[in-house]
Structure formats: C-alpha cells, structure tokens
C-alpha cells in the first residue's frame, strides 16, 4: 500500500533559502516535503532578445531526484505561499497539481493514483487573516478521498495547545471544513510546540496541524522533529 510509503515532512520556513537546503540535507528519509512561506527570489539572468542584460528568472530552488509542485504567480505581487517537493521514487503514482479544482496561492492541492483510485493530499498556509479558510468557506469544493490536509494554520486553541487557555471561533470553521472533507485532527505523538519564538517573553506555539482521512489507521499519527 502506498499509504505505508508516504513519509511527509511539513514546515513553515519563513522564506529562508538556507532552511530549504538544510531540509534536503538532513531529511532525506522523507519522500514528500510540504513547505509554507517558501523562498521565491531571483535565481539567475537568462538570455533575452528584448533585453541585452538578460531577463530575471524568479522562482524556487530545484533539486535532483525531486519533482517540484507550486501554483506559479499570475501577477507580480501574487507570491506563492505553499509549495511541495515529491521524490521521483513515487513517480509511478502520477502526482499532479489540481488547479482546476482549487486555485489559491495559499493552498496546494495534489492528486495521485494508487490501484486506479485517485487520492489527494493538501498543503495549506493560512495567514493571520485566515485567507485559506475563508476561501473554503466561500467556495463550493467537492472533494472525496483527501488523505491529508496539513500546514501552518496560524490558529492557537486549547484543543491542540495545552498552554493556550481559549477556544477560538475560527477553530470551529476549521473543523467544519475538515469534516466536509471527512478528515479528523491528528493527535501528536509527542506534545511539543511546532513554532519556537525567537523573542524573549513570547510563548512558543502549536499552530502547525495535520488532519487525516477518517478511519484510516495507517495515517493515524505524526510527531514533531525538534531539530
């Protein structure tokens, strides 16, 4: 079963190119990498017939043996906020970006085939305004067989963060969305923060969450890599 072979690593890297390189150097045992707030910068100058100095090539780094998935910006300031790398060892499952179903810069919706069954995985970055969640609330999206929805949701709640004493209304919206996709919140194997503050006096956070397909025990746990 492919479910036993899906090893997904997810992290908000705050547009830091060095972190991306470090992930590839140290987390090679994963075969799917979900990135939130990725680097999107000048890579090089390419030959141009219209500009003697060359045209600027903007994008994210590519790596050998990895397939790159991202919704490319449609306008200059429409920077992408999620991307994914999938190892070529999974190429036979025909992973594909489904922009015809979900087309939003904060949501990466990817399909794959296993035993002629189409399944999906989803990478999300929800900003402080919860743009991704508002998109789902305002857009009718019929999705079946979504295996995992994960990423940086930017929501604190006592339901998943014991150090936070409140329950927020936006959390209810998140659970309604997850329930519509037949997903359950995955419980941490190790109860630790997912985001450590660099500022003295600020609390560490649990805002990176994983929702898994209901009843699929093979995907029923995850843990935080402290390094």
Predicted segments with their positions:
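A shared catalytic/ligand-binding motif for oxyanion handling
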Residues: 1-227
């Amino acid at each position: 079963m492919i479910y036993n072979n899906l090893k997904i690593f997810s992290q908000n890297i705050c547009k830091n190119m060095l972190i991306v390189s470090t992930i590839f150097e140290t987390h090679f045992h994963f075969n799917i990498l979900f990135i939130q707030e990725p680097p999107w910068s000048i890579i090089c100058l390419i030959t141009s017939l219209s500009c003697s100095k060359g045209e600027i090539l903007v994008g994210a780094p590519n790596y050998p043996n990895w397939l790159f998935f991202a919704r490319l910006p449609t306008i200059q300031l429409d920077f992408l906020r999620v991307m994914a790398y999938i190892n070529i060892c999974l190429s036979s499952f025909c992973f594909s970006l489904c922009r015809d179903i979900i087309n939003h810069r904060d949501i990466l919706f990817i399909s794959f085939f296993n035993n002629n069954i189409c399944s999906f995985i989803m990478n999300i970055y929800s900003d402080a305004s919860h743009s991704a969640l508002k998109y789902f609330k305002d857009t009718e999206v019929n999705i079946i067989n979504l295996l995992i929805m994960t990423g940086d949701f930017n929501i604190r709640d006592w339901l998943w963060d014991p150090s936070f004493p409140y329950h927020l209304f936006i959390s209810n919206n998140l659970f309604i969305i997850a329930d519509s996709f037949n997903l359950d919140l995955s419980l941490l194997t190790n109860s630790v923060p997912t985001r450590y503050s660099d500022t003295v006096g600020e609390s560490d956070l649990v805002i990176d969450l994983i929702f898994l397909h209901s009843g699929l025990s093979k995907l029923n746990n995850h843990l935080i890599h402290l390094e």
